[in-house]
């Protein structure tokens, strides 16, 4: 797939990347639109230690689901990834999950963003 990759401070490279792997319980999304957020700009300028190159930025994403229950449906991605196991997640307060992360971030774990043809 083609993706716009943050490769260095103030440097983005349009290049071929591997398609995202299917993750149990998630869908592969064919990206139709992806916004550029202020936090993406902070990363671009080297001002966000949670986003380190190389990384596909972009966490404001919509597109068409390619698999699963939502196959062929238009979807808007919730960029928040929570553990679904802690007391906050079990009480529908995923935004407080101590293990949470987001797409388009490299810390606490790498999860590629939506400035690409596909996202998981």
Task: Outline where the language-model segments fall.
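Short N-terminal binding/cap micro-motifs at the start of the first secondary-structure element
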Residues: 10-14, 38-39
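Short Gly/Pro-enriched turn/cap motifs at secondary-structure boundaries
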Residues: 18-19, 52-58, 106-111, 117
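Extreme N-terminal starter segment of soluble prokaryotic enzymes
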Residues: 1-2
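NAD(P)H dinucleotide-binding glycine-rich loop of Rossmann-like/cofactor-binding domains
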Residues: 83-120
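Glycine-rich beta-strand-centered segment in the early N-terminal region that forms part
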Residues: 20-34, 47-90
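Cytochrome P450 core scaffold surrounding the K-helix E-X-X-R motif
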Residues: 39-45
């Amino acid at each position: 797939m083609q993706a716009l990759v943050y490769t260095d401070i103030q440097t983005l490279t349009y290049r071929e990347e591997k398609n995202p792997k299917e993750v149990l319980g998630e869908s592969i999304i064919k990206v139709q639109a992806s916004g550029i957020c202020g936090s993406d700009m902070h990363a671009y300028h080297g001002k966000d230690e949670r986003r380190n190159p190389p990384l596909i930025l972009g966490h404001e994403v919509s597109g068409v689901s390619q698999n699963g229950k939502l196959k062929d449906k238009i979807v808007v991605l919730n960029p928040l990834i929570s553990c679904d196991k802690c007391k906050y997640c079990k009480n529908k307060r995923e935004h407080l999950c101590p293990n949470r992360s987001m797409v388009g971030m490299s810390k606490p774990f790498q999860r590629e963003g939506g400035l690409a043809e596909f996202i998981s």
